[in-house]
């Protein structure tokens, strides 16, 4: 299971890097979102998980608990990532409405504009 999770995280990092290096602004935002998901998986993989683990809410005697702190951190990271993605999409939308361009190379401007 750890090998599969490691391969999924590596694949997400690869795809995120590929998308961030493109010149289209929407692809860059999608790449940043994929990086966020890869980071969340890395944080979740640090905790103990599996079918033999139990919730920390059991009244009786339980030995193996899942760490709830990592789940809280990932939940917070998901909310922050969603807010960041929404802000970047609105920023790109506004930039497109003003400049009619959605590529980074077109947004550099001319040398005469300085």
Curated annotation (Swiss-Prot):
Molecular function as annotated in GO: antiporter activity
Entry keywords, A to Z: Antiport, Cell membrane, Ion transport, Membrane, Transmembrane, Transmembrane helix, Transport
InterPro entries according to UniProt: CPA3_antiporter_subunitC, NUOK/Mnh_C1-like
Localisation: Cell membrane
Membrane topology: Multi-pass membrane protein
GO cellular component: plasma membrane
Primary site of residence: membrane
Chain segments annotated as transmembrane: 3-23, 25-45, 72-92
Pfam short name (any one): Oxidored_q2
Source organism superkingdom: Bacteria
Subunit annotation: May form a heterooligomeric complex that consists of seven subunits: mnhA2, mnhB2, mnhC2, mnhD2, mnhE2, mnhF2 and mnhG2.
NCBIfam families reported for this sequence: PRK12660.1 (NF009303)
Family of this protein: Belongs to the CPA3 antiporters (TC 2.A.63) subunit C family.
Protein name: Putative antiporter subunit mnhC2
Native species: Staphylococcus epidermidis (strain ATCC 35984 / DSM 28319 / BCRC 17069 / CCUG 31568 / BM 3577 / RP62A)
Lineage: Bacteria, Bacillati, Bacillota, Bacilli, Bacillales
């Amino acid at each position: 299971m750890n090998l599969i999770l490691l391969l999924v995280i590596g694949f997400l990092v690869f795809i995120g890097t590929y998308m961030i290096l493109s010149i289209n602004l929407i692809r860059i935002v999608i790449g940043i979102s994929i990086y966020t998901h890869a980071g969340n998986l890395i944080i979740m993989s640090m905790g103990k998980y599996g079918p033999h683990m139990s919730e920390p809410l059991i009244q009786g005697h339980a030995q193996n608990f899942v760490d709830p702190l990592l789940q809280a951190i990932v939940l917070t990271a998901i909310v922050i990532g969603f807010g960041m993605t929404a802000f970047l999409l609105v920023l790109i939308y506004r930039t497109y409405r003003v400049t009619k361009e959605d590529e980074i190379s077109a947004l550099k401007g001319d040398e005469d504009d300085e």
